[in-house]
Curated annotation (Swiss-Prot):
A Gene Ontology BP annotation from the UniProt entry: viral translational frameshifting
Induction profile: Ty1-DR3 is a weakly expressed element. Induced under amino acid starvation conditions by GCN4.
Naturally occurring in which organism (per UniProt): Saccharomyces cerevisiae (strain ATCC 204508 / S288c)
UniProt feature coiled coil, ranges: none
PTM-bearing positions, type Phosphoserine: 416
Keywords: Cytoplasm, Phosphoprotein, RNA-binding, Transposable element
Swiss-Prot/TrEMBL site (Cleavage) positions: 401-402
Name the record gives this protein: Transposon Ty1-DR3 Gag polyprotein
GO molecular function: RNA binding
Biased composition, class Polar residues, residue ranges: 1-10, 48-60, 127-152, 402-428
Recorded GO CC terms: cytoplasm
Record note on quaternary structure: Homotrimer.
More info: Retrotransposons are mobile genetic entities that are able to replicate via an RNA intermediate and a reverse transcription step. In contrast to retroviruses, retrotransposons are non-infectious, lack an envelope and remain intracellular. Ty1 retrotransposons belong to the copia elements (pseudoviridae).
Region of interest called RNA-binding, as start-end residue ranges on this chain: 299-401
Length: 440
């Protein structure tokens, strides 16, 4: 009877029922099924009282749980499973929410949905208040970022102790592909610069300007984990995080090195496409420059074969080297080394021809001395030339007169005439000049 009566009252716990039955068995030896009508009435009153208490105070389990609902308690939210970011090493709420974020924003000010948050991302105060960003947030990568020095807009200034500002810092876009990581990290670095964290970014030599603080490292880790999901990270980034999941600085340093390498590759391609050579520089220097560019490109995965390299080199030749375009352009198996052999041959020929030419250039002081000596030596010549010319003219007249008289004279014969042509004619003048027939 008692078991039938208990089955009619499901709200009475099984433990209490067993306890009552056990107590009856311990104190008395009465059959538990043999119960009087008065006892049944007592059970009815007890069950009615229990039903009234359960009606006024409903159990917490009566409300169904929503697995996607963010509980106000941070500990009740399941942490995200993000691969390289181990949840056993996650930071506490006090570590993730320092008080010194007034200068460059706070991880809690970043837009994300509640079910993506782990306990370390919960901001202080009501969890239902999330900042609303203007329409410019989430724009493409090509859109310019706000000016440096801006901070996030604080939508909960009444409950937060952070300094509220009117301007905001646009966060980087979400990484959606490993191939987009080089472009994404540029926007992430710009985001850090706009957040007054440009001093912690590694420079060209791989070292930051100043030492990063613990709060800044927390901010760096939080923002990188939120906007760069682990499934979209490149392999080399995952390798770094597998060693130290908080070493975001090493990732930034490697990214900057890759940016510089990409810039060098672009410069090398432009330089190789715009080569110019006319022999004004040594052929050895020109060959070293070209071969270094080709080697760097090949090492970085940009392969330049001999055919393409020779075409680019020959296109930039000018002057005496220009004819190499037409003598070698049909050789399909020509190498860069063979082309430079021809360039060296022309350059050496040019240098040899220049060295063989006489050098007429003289010092300026020697030219002045020569001009002075020339003026001094020409003056006596000018003075001595006029009387000589006069005497010569007189001797010619006297000679002509003597010749005419000798011809007209009967005592002269042809032998004397022929003899006079071979012997000098003696003239009686004060200069005693000796003239030959070919002089007049």
């Amino acid at each position: 009877m008692e078991s039938q009566q208990l089955s009619n009252y499901p709200h009475i716990s099984h433990g209490s029922a067993c306890a009552s039955v056990t107590s009856k068995e311990v104190h008395t030896n009465q059959d538990p099924l043999d119960v009087s009508a008065s006892k049944i009435q007592e059970y009815d009153k007890a069950s009615t009282k229990a039903n009234s208490q359960q009606t006024t105070t409903p159990a917490s389990s009566a409300v169904p749980e929503n697995p996607h609902h963010a509980s106000p308690q941070p500990a009740s939210v399941p942490p995200p499973q993000n691969g390289p970011y181990p949840q056993q090493c996650m930071m506490t709420q006090n570590q993730a929410n320092p008080s010194g974020w007034s200068f460059y924003g706070h991880p809690s000010m970043i837009p994300y949905t509640p079910y993506q948050m782990s306990p370390m991302y919960f901001p202080p105060g009501p969890q239902s208040q999330f900042p609303q960003y203007p329409s410019s947030v989430g724009t493409p990568l090509s859109t310019p970022s706000p000016e440096s020095g801006n901070t996030f807009t604080d939508s909960s200034s009444a409950d937060s102790d952070m300094t509220s500002t009117k301007k905001y810092v646009r966060p980087p876009p979400m990484l959606t592909s490993p191939n987009d990581f080089p472009n994404w990290v540029k926007t992430y670095i710009k985001f850090l610069q706009n957040s007054n964290l440009g001093g912690i970014i590694p420079t060209v030599n791989g070292k930051p300007v100043r030492q990063i603080t613990d709060d800044e490292l927390t901010f760096l880790y939080n923002t990188f984990q939120i906007f760069a999901p682990s499934q979209f990270l490149p392999t080399w980034v995952k390798d770094i995080l597998s060693v130290d999941y908080t070493d975001i600085m090493k990732i930034l340093s490697k990214s900057i090195e890759k940016m510089q390498s990409d810039t060098q590759e672009a410069n090398d391609i432009v330089t190789l496409a715009n080569l110019q050579y006319n022999g004004s520089t040594p052929a050895d220097a020109f060959e070293t420059k070209v071969t270094n560019i080709i080697d760097r490109l090949n090492n970085n995965g940009i392969h330049i074969n001999n055919k393409v390299a020779c075409q680019l080199i020959m296109r930039g030749l000018s002057g005496e080297y220009k004819f190499l375009r037409y003598t070698r352009h049909r050789h399909l198996n020509m190498t860069v080394a063979e082309l430079f052999l021809d360039i060296h041959a022309i350059y050496e020929e040019q240098q040899g021809s220049r060295n063989s030419k006489p050098n007429y250039r003289r010092n300026r002081s020697d030219e002045k001395n020569d001009s002075r000596s020339y003026t001094n030596t020409t003056k006596p010549k000018v003075i001595a030339r006029n009387p000589q010319k006069t005497n010569n003219s007189k001797s010619k007249t006297a000679r002509a007169h003597n010749v005419s008289t000798s011809i007209n004279s009967p005592s002269t014969d042809n032998d004397s005439i022929s003899k006079s042509t071979t012997e000098p004619i003696q003239l009686n003048n004060k200069h005693d000049l000796h003239l030959r027939p070919e002089t007049y």
